[in-house]
């Protein structure tokens, strides 16, 4: 069964409420994917044509560039439903923040999700060794986030939570914040089971 995203954001107070609704829809979308093992998003020619008039994505998803992690599949979303930002290790810098700001301020996207995943090579590199070339910038960022943690799963969690804190610090600390703290959610995708674990519920 296809998950339909219907909610439109009108103002900041509505955005907080809408973000909660969208989050629940993402959870249902992931449950549908885990159950069916199939892609249920709308990628029809009709949807593609409708989107030529503009986009109104329901969530920003910052995730790893890993080929096994496809947000639209994981959350049963189709064209135009997710504003996806991908970078190895799902790390945050000024470029990612700029993309988030564009989605939230210009496209009125109500929810930001940081999605890490199990078996992340960038996290493994931060745990076990030095990185050469440009990769070291990513690894150094993750190493700073995970500190002395040695467990791969816990390190993945810490990396995601650190990214969430950076986003909240960038957009939620002002008197008139672009994002409320409740509009930022942290999660980890299990590449074996297909399930998404939502960290903010327990931390």
Where would I find each of the regions flagged by the language model?
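Divalent-metal-activated hydrolytic enzyme cores
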Residues: 2-54, 80, 90-98, 102-108, ...
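Short secondary-structure boundary/capping segments
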Residues: 51, 74-75
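Active-site-flanking structural segment that lines cofactor/substrate pockets
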Residues: 55, 59-63, 67-73
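Short active-site oxyanion
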Residues: 58-60, 109-112
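Short beta-strand segments
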Residues: 62-64, 86, 113-117, 185-190
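Short glycine-enriched loops at secondary-structure junctions
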Residues: 63-69, 88-91, 129
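Gly/Ser/Thr-rich loops at beta-strand to alpha-helix junctions
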Residues: 66-68, 117-122
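Short helix-loop-beta junction
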Residues: 76-84
């Amino acid at each position: 069964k296809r998950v339909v995203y219907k909610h439109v954001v009108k103002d900041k107070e509505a955005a907080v409420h809408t973000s909660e609704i969208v989050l629940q829809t993402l959870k249902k979308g992931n449950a549908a994917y885990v159950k069916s093992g199939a892609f249920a998003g709308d990628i029809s020619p009709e949807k593609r044509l409708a989107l030529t008039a503009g986009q109104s994505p329901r969530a920003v998803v910052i995730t790893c560039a890993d080929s096994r992690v496809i947000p639209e599949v994981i959350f049963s979303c189709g064209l135009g439903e997710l504003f996806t930002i991908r970078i190895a290790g799902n790390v945050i810098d000024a470029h990612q923040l700029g993309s988030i700001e564009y989605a939230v301020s210009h496209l009125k996207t109500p929810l930001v999700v940081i999605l890490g995943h199990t078996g992340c090579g960038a996290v493994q590199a931060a745990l076990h060794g030095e990185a050469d070339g440009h990769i070291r910038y990513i690894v150094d960022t993750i190493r700073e986030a995970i500190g002395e943690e040695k467990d791969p799963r816990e390190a993945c969690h810490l990396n995601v939570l650190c990214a969430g804190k950076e986003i909240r610090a960038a957009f939620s600390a002002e008197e008139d914040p672009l994002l409320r703290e409740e509009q930022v959610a942290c999660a980890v995708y299990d590449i074996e089971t297909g399930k998404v674990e939502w960290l903010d519920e327990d931390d």
